[in-house]
Amino acid sequence: MDFIRSEILGTKFETTIRYANVRPVGLGAFGLVCSAYDQITQQSVAIKKMMSPFASSAIAKRTYREVKLLKKLRHENLIGLCDIFISPLEDIYLVTELLGTDLSRLLRSKPLENKFAQFFMYQLMRGLKYIHSAGVIHRDLKPSNLLINENCDLKICDFGLARVQEPRMTGYVSTRYYRAPEIMLTWQRYGVEVDIWSAGCILAEMLRGVPLFPGKDHINQFYLITDMIGNPPLEVIEKITSKNTRHIVDSLPHKEPRQLKTIFNEEDAEAVDLLEKMLLFDQSKRISAAESLEHPYLAPYHDPTDEPVAEEKFDWSFNDADLPKESWKYMIYSEVLDFHSMEAHSSGYMTQDDFASVLEFVDQNQFAET
């Protein structure tokens, strides 16, 4: 398999000769993303170089999780994995569909008409229904993770923080503005409902044009939430396990919930009704993704015959494993092999020589700790 190496934004970027016209799109903490032209499919694609994927055991595990999720989760409203390869410098490259913009950029450019907010919200909840049915929590929903093309098709991306529901889960996930209160209150146990809260914040932002809860810090974020929907009910407060957090909550002045319709008085009443069912302190009372698709606000697009769920739950058996980074590395390479094996059988895009090159690359790598 032949590679072309270039330097983009100060980073070595290696692609197979299959991809031409490589141009930078964005640089983040976990990767450099470029646009390119796939000379086989004759489609524009996005290529993400995962930065230092084997720098530590934790990072290697995160890399494995994202690769495995992208491979497994297949839905019209999720970003699709087109190709994956390992470069000579042993970096991981993920090739996905290329969409022209994201919701964050749209919201910065001009106010969003309600009909567009409605269509985007339907697609977001349709994608979440599928994700949640697979036993996956996205955990980092925000406008910049919702990609949109010129046809207004929306696709959820960035599954680097996605997790299974666990008895104890870390609290520092999701951009603050879209973070569910149970994450701030307990930092331990939560479920798919955190994505529903984030989706509600996104809907509110589409309707208002600005973030609903633009907290300056963790405490200010919680204060803004209580100022809008009132103090958390007793049954929620009783679930707080941190003494410091409980003290902060108890010290907050009493706030009565405000009627959201007074804040969104010029907006669609049905949109506000959906918001009220999403932005609830008690996660057990929030509307689910599947239920939201049946809500009157999304009724114009609702089609129960075309809102699929996952065929099976995602396999999280690896999640509790504490392995050295070289073991994760080997597992990632195995996933790459498996992906190309499936692609070779289904599409014919990958030649026998290409597949042999991947296999040879894996065989030649030594997976002992150095």
Swiss-Prot record:
Q: Per UniProt, where does ATP bind?
A: V25, G26, L27, G28, A29, F30, G31, L32, V33, K48
Q: Which organism is it from?
A: Aspergillus terreus (strain NIH 2624 / FGSC A1156)
What functional role does this protein have? Answer: Mitogen-activated protein kinase required for growth on media where sorbitol or mannitol is the sole carbon source.
Q: How is it modified after translation?
A: Dually phosphorylated on Thr-170 and Tyr-172, which activates the enzyme.
User: EC annotation?
Assistant: 2.7.11.24
Provide the protein name: Mitogen-activated protein kinase mpkC
Q: Which UniProt keywords apply?
A: ATP-binding, Kinase, Nucleotide-binding, Phosphoprotein, Serine/threonine-protein kinase, Transferase
Task: Please report, in chain numbering, the residue ranges of the motif TXY.
Answer: 170-172
GO-annotated molecular function:
ATP binding; MAP kinase activity; protein serine kinase activity
| SUPFAM superfamilies, alphabetized | Protein kinase-like (PK-like)
Q: What is known of its domains?
A: The TXY motif contains the threonine and tyrosine residues whose phosphorylation activates the MAP kinases.
Parts of the chain that traverse the membrane: none
> Which PANTHER family would you find in this protein's record?
MITOGEN-ACTIVATED PROTEIN KINASE
* Family statement drawn from the similarity comment of this UniProt entry: Belongs to the protein kinase superfamily. Ser/Thr protein kinase family. MAP kinase subfamily. HOG1 sub-subfamily.
Residues bearing PTM Phosphotyrosine? Y172
Catalytic residues in the record: D140
InterPro entries found in the cross-reference section: Kinase-like_dom_sf, MAP_kinase, MAP_kinase_CS, Prot_kinase_dom, Protein_kinase_ATP_BS, Ser/Thr_kinase_AS
Limits of the Protein kinase domain: 19-298
List, separated by semicolons, the cofactors it needs: Mg(2+)
Summary of activators and inhibitors of this protein: Activated by tyrosine and threonine phosphorylation.
> In the record, what lineage is assigned to the organism producing the protein?
Eukaryota, Fungi, Dikarya, Ascomycota, Pezizomycotina
Please give the catalytic activity noted in the UniProt record. L-seryl-[protein] + ATP = O-phospho-L-seryl-[protein] + ADP + H(+); L-threonyl-[protein] + ATP = O-phospho-L-threonyl-[protein] + ADP + H(+)
For the modification Phosphothreonine, the affected residues are T170
